[in-house]
Amino acid sequence: MVYQTKRDVPVTLMIVFLILLIQADAIVPFVLGNMRVSGWIIFILLTLLNGLIIWSFIDLKYVLKEHHLIIKAGLIKHQIPYENIDKVVQKKKLWSGFRLIGSRHAITIYYQGGWGHAVISPQKSEEFIHKLKEKNSNIIIFTKSK
């Protein structure tokens, strides 16, 4: 089952601001009129970076497979076996952890191995947590308001 990320205005605005800032930096050599080979290289690299950021933000989803959870954002694909998941914490905290999100309202999944935890923001988070619990009944669920 595929869950798209929940997106909210503040996170989307941050991403748009970051993209505009990077692209503005890429066109500085054009504006200053001293476009050399190095300026073209910088322009191309920063434009590609923006493409990766946009792709990661648009293609952000969480897939519940038979034996593992897949977190996918552009080129990034992270698999977490259900038996490795210890607990799930619901909270509203934007600035922590390995985050592949589009919203401030997040779920932190703690698991054994890899990064140790992943912060995600699926649409229908209650349903998502319920499905995770079906896959591994040993998962402990916590809810935090902050």
UniProtKB/Swiss-Prot annotation:
The protein, known as: Uncharacterized protein YyaB
Superkingdom classification of source: Bacteria
GO terms classed as biological process: bacteriocin immunity
